[in-house]
Amino acid sequence: MTDISRRGFLAAGTAMLAAQALPRIAMARPVPIPLIAGSRVLDIDGRAATVWGLTGPLGQGLSFDPGQRFEVNLRNDLPEPTIIHWHGQIPPNRQDGVPDMPMPPLNTGETRSYDYELMPGTYWMHAHIPMHEMRLLAAPLIVRSADDIAADRQEAVMFLHDFSFKPPQEVMEEIAGGHGETAAPQSGTTPQSGMNHAMTGGMKMDPGMMGQAGMPGMDGMPDMSKMAAMAMDLNDYDWDAYLANDRTLNDPDVIAVDPGGRVRLRIVNAAAATVFWIDTGALQARLVAVDGHAVQPLSGNRFGLSMAQRMDLEIDLPAGGGSWPVLALREGGRERTGIVLATAGAQVARLAPLADEAAPAFDTDLAQEGRLIAAAPLVARATQRQHMVMLGGSMTPYLWTINGRSW
């Protein structure tokens, strides 16, 4: 029998208790956090789908606490080279994750180390190589602030994707050939070929349409011929499924909540080519942050979210028990996905993946975006430098550029 001292026994016991009490990866640790770009299998409406993902110690994505640095070892277990962009964060340029600017993609089996100071907020990470993000190579990147830690509220994440069982190259060929809209021809936005996020949407509007085509409940009667043209250009592709936390509404992610509690819902639109309306239904919500930064709260129960955008909604739940869906409605279509907030023992009603009516176009008159005010605005000062940025693109070839270059 091996002898053990009292001090050794206490030290071992303390270590075991600490390991059980601190399961979060956001605790300080002497070694970098492992993050693996690899394949995984999802059950999408009863059909197995092999997709890609970014897996940390606790599953898809990473979460950090105040003061923690982004000390991560990224390993590529995929069958081809890839590279990951830390969307919204500002790392040193060598760690930013755009291919060959200046670092090349990681080869299969290669590991690369990252270390930079994090900004708090709701962010995400994704491949910066065409076709890879369409394979769902993306995940949440959540950085909590000191206020988040102190707040008396629960946090939850809603991560949105559009998905096709077809290979991404085949999807792109169909879009480029004008055959991407097979079921709902009122389809606008463009797939993120090279992840060009500078354009908020792919809608083609002439100046006369601005201010005419409003959101639901807005005054003004637009020219119907222009409305018809706009409606035909809302979506470039009809996907096989729309996912929230890797699930459809046939088997939604049900998140346990407390009666009368407050929830901060961090929502990421990681879709390749879909704008969503976030609909909280019977629950009134407050939009408190956009793209990782706090804004003066906006109240409502429907908010638009374009590709690559993030928003944080704060929701106060009723004192009684119940279940409340939070839906993501496809712009210009009937398709929808979402999650369910539910108290213990509450009945969760089945939700149809198709709504009764198509959702409208998002924010053509900037009714939402024009009301956003930063909670901590920049200090007013005179302009010191100006840069001209030219946005370009076309359907044939299917290419979107900034200053003549794709990204």
Question: Which ranges hold each PLM region?
Answer:
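Histidine- and aromatic-rich segments of cupredoxin/plastocyanin-like copper-binding domains
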Residues: 95-96, 104-106, 222-366, 375-380
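Short, Lys/Arg- and Gly-enriched loop/turn segments at beta-strand edges
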Residues: 79-85, 122-124, 275, 321-324
